């Protein structure tokens, strides 16, 4: 880049700002556009598909209109860039007061990153948009996460082995981490597994003492004990997260919710592999369709949808809380008409959680306040409807909804019903709410009549009946006369000559224009002042309105779970502090949709805590394993479950080792990943955990695999004593583990008919003697010759005393079978 003195004052100012925010694309405000220069312009031009031009002779340049900048900023952020927004902080007139040649002052007012978005247009309404932070002190890790658009703020202490599941559960848009931690091999593997923007800082940024000062400063307390009981590593994570938010908002932080500690004992910990294998939020291929959330999310509000996802990410581990939710779901199942009325009222309910955040950040628009007024009106209607019920759950929600009629009345009196997204032009405040505004409105309303009177006067004066008075942004008001006429009156001053017309002005027209423009300007300023006062009043009530928003979201979730229960014939499970796990005629909540699903029982209660399932591939072993884990998850969020009867003792952790998860990018083979995941289960499971293991020990030599599988089953049975379902293709395993007192054996029922194998997907007691692998190979499209060859080898192996004693088997005969 050339020497700075070679550039214009504007470009020198741009370069000085760019040096401060080198990691960001700098959007530099010039009038009604945001401009980008140099390499930033090249990047933005390609990313946004906008024209790349030049300023001067060789400076790359492109720009986007100010009024539509949000969408462009969103596209840049989604493409992985951070965006520094540079605004003019004074007018050209104010700059000239300092000096005739003074450059307008500009400052970066905000840095836009994936985790700090608050604008609706840049966010997915039904998805939580978390900014997360991981800090580290010794062997403890602090995980803090915030949704800036709603104010949600949580933290918890964790261990290295739990970080994968923590990030998987949260799915943050952006993760803040130290340079040192980022470079650790163990952390590098975790980060590669998740798709989110990574922002790293040096180690001192995460210093716990520094973080404590930030926390105390933001919340106005002298000690963090005033906020709650936090571990040092939690303080580090929270304070560092807040400091980063303060940096991106350029010091402008509204009143934020206190960080709440998520105690590990308060929710069911679902490990990372289980979150992926159970497909709670997306399928293995990344699609939402086919996931559990896609099946049960019948919510009718964005807030409810986000709350339901939080329920699934953090299933409750307290049977009293679970039973309270179940009571509410059962109430709505039994009161269908009320349920439908409530859902009708809240359908399309404005996303006031995010609106309130924009109010607190002073980034709300007239449209936001109009939507807030509509929401308060719906809350009033909702309160009136549910007040007829005396049910304890409804009474609690009614209290949370509160009474906002005074604020609703104020909004109705002040705001006009329009969808203005910017405030500078006015036109959104009811003139009747302010005497001066009403007077200014009359002046503006009368301006058309006054202009018309002046036009008629000038037509009479000049004798030109086609004379017009028009206006544009360049000239303001002007008199236009056809070129075929000559105006001789000296009061008419020529302003512009065109091919077919001449434009004039007069002192009288200038005076009238000044009155109109002055009224418009004063009116816009006054509207902005009134709007600011209204927003300040709303900000004072944000906490109460926030409670109402949460109550609406909760109503949405509870009525949704009731609707799903009725539509899909779910039953209320018994959830208590026992170690029971008994499911009668359970079904897979996702697979059963649109199919004739075969229901099966599962009993892992005390004395029968482990089930070992054998059977061929495609018989339904993996589906059975997953369905019972999903039933457990549903039970722990307070939902009814797909079964005829269910009794589940509270689970502390759910572990899953199901399906291949080979990840070449991580440098691990399928078998290595399987062993790592199995080791985590054996080390972390407890007697209150639920473990599902599918085909443990495959991917290595038979003796190795069988030994590993037997050792894993023995460890779970004797040491962790977890409730467990294991599926295996080792037919020796049931015989070798038959002496375990708490194990039972099942297989999937198969029938052979006319030489074909029929999978009945029915679980029955017993041990499968065959795998039917050759039949599955045929279904998969094996060439006929290869299939016949496989049958030949199998017959030879069956003739041997033991299928691993193959030295005496002649496999050379019949090799020349060809496909037909």
Swiss-Prot record:
Gene3D superfamilies hit by this protein: 1.10.1420.10, DNA repair protein MutS, domain I (3.40.1170.10), MutS, connector domain (3.30.420.110), P-loop containing nucleotide triphosphate hydrolases (3.40.50.300)
Xref: Pfam families: MutS_I (PF01624), MutS_II (PF05188), MutS_III (PF05192), MutS_IV (PF05190), MutS_V (PF00488)
Record keywords: ATP-binding, DNA damage, DNA repair, DNA-binding, Nucleotide-binding
GO biological process terms, semicolon-separated: mismatch repair
Residues given in the record as ATP binding sites: 615-622
Keyword ATP-binding attributed: yes
Alphabetized GO MF terms: ATP binding; ATP-dependent DNA damage sensor activity; damaged DNA binding; mismatched DNA binding
UniProt similarity note: Belongs to the DNA mismatch repair MutS family.
HAMAP family named among the record's database cross-references: MutS
Entry function: This protein is involved in the repair of mismatches in DNA. It is possible that it carries out the mismatch recognition step. This protein has a weak ATPase activity.
PANTHER family (UniProt xref): DNA MISMATCH REPAIR PROTEIN MSH1, MITOCHONDRIAL, DNA MISMATCH REPAIR PROTEIN MUTS FAMILY MEMBER
Protein name: DNA mismatch repair protein MutS
Gene behind this protein: mutS
């Amino acid at each position: 880049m050339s020497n700075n003195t070679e550039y214009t004052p504007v470009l020198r100012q741009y370069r000085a700002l760019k040096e401060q925010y080198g990691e960001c694309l700098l959007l530099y405000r010039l009038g009604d556009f945001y401009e980008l220069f140099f390499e930033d312009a090249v990047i933005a031009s390609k990313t946004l598909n906008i024209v790349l031009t030049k300023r001067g002779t060789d400076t790359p340049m492109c720009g986007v209109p100010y009024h539509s900048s949000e969408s462009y900023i969103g596209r840049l952020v989604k493409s992985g860039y951070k965006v520094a927004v540079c605004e003019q902080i004074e007018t050209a007139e104010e700059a000239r007061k300092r000096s005739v040649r003074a450059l307008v002052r500009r400052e970066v007012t905000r840095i836009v990153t994936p985790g700090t978005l608050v604008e609706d247009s840049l966010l997915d309404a039904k998805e939580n948009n978390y900014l997360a932070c991981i800090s580290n002190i010794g062997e403890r890790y602090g995980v803090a996460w915030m949704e800036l658009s709603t104010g949600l703020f949580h933290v918890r202490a964790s261990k290295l082995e739990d970080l994968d599941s923590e990030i998987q559960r949260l799915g943050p848009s952006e993760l803040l981490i130290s340079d040192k931690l980022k470079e650790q091999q163990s952390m590098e593997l975790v980060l590669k597994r998740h798709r989110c923007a990574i922002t790293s800082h040096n180690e001192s940024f995460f210093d716990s003492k520094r973080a404590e000062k930030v926390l105390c400063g933001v919340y106005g307390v002298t000690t963090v004990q005033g906020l709650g009981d936090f571990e040092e590593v939690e303080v580090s994570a929270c304070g560092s997260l807040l400091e980063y938010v303060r940096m991106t908002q350029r010091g402008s932080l509204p009143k934020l919710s206190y960080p709440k500690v998520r105690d590990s004992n308060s929710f069911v910990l679902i490990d990372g592999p289980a979150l992926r294998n159970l497909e709670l939020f997306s399928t293995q291929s990344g699609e939402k369709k086919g996931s559990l959330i896609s099946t049960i999310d019948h919510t009718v509000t964005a807030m409810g949808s986000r709350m339901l996802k939080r329920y699934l990410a953090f299933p409750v581990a307290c049977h009293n809380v679970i039973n309270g939710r179940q009571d509410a779901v059962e109430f709505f199942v039994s009161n269908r008409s009320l349920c439908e009325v409530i859902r009708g009222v809240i359908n399309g309910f404005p996303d006031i959680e995010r609106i309130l955040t924009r109010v607190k950040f002073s980034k709300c628009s007239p449209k936001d306040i109009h939507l807030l007024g509509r929401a308060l009106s719906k809350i009033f209607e909702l309160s009136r409807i549910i007040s007829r019920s005396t049910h304890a759950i409804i009474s609690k929600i009614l209290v949370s909804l509160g009474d906002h009629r005074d604020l609703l009345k104020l909004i109705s009196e002040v705001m006009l019903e329009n969808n203005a997204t910017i405030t500078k032009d006015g036109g959104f405040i009811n003139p009747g709410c302010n005497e001066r505004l009403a007077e200014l409105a009359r002046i503006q309303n009368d301006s058309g009549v006054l202009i018309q009177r002046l036009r008629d006067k000038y037509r009479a004066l000049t004798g030109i009946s086609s004379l017009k008075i028009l206006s544009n942004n360049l000239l303001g008001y002007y008199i236009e006369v056809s070129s075929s006429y000559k105006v001789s009156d000296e009061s008419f001053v020529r302003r512009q000559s065109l091919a077919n017309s001449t434009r004039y002005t007069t002192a009288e027209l200038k005076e009238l224009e000044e009155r109109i423009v002055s009224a418009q300007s004063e009116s816009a300023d006054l509207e902005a002042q009134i709007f600011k006062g209204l927003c300040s009043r709303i900000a004072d009530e944000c906490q109460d309105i926030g409670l109402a928003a949460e109550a609406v979201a909760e109503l949405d979730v509870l009525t949704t779970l009731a609707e799903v229960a009725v539509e899909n014939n779910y039953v209320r499970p018994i959830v208590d502090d026992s170690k029971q796990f008994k499911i009668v005629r359970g079904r897979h909540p996702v697979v059963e949709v649109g199919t004739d699903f075969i229901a099966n029982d599962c009993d892992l209660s005390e004395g029968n805590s482990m089930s070992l399932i054998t059977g061929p591939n495609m018989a339904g072993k993996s589906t059975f394993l997953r369905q019972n884990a999903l039933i457990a998850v549903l039970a722990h969020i307070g939902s009814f479950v797909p079964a005829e009867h269910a009794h589940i003792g509270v689970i502390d952790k759910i572990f899953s080792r199901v399906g291949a998860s080979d990840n070449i990018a991580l440098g691990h083979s399928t078998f290595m990943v399987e062993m790592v995941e199995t080791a985590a289960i054996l080390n972390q499971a407890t007697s209150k955990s639920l473990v599902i293991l599918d085909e443990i020990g495959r991917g290595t030599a038979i003796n190795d695999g069988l030994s590993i599988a037997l050792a894993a089953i023995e460890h779970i049975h004797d040491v962790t004593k977890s409730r467990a379902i294991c599926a295996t293709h080792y037919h020796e395993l049931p015989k070798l583990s038959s002496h375990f007192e708490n194990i039972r054996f099942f297989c999937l029922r198969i029938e052979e008919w006319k030489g074909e194998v029929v999978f009945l997907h029915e679980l029955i007691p017993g041990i499968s003697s065959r795998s039917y692998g050759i039949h599955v190979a045929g279904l998969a499209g094996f060439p006929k010759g290869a299939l016949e060859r496989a049958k030949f080898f199998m017959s030879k192996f069956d003739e041997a005393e033991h299928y691993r004693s193959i030295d005496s088997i002649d496999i050379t005969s019949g090799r020349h079978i060809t496909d037909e």
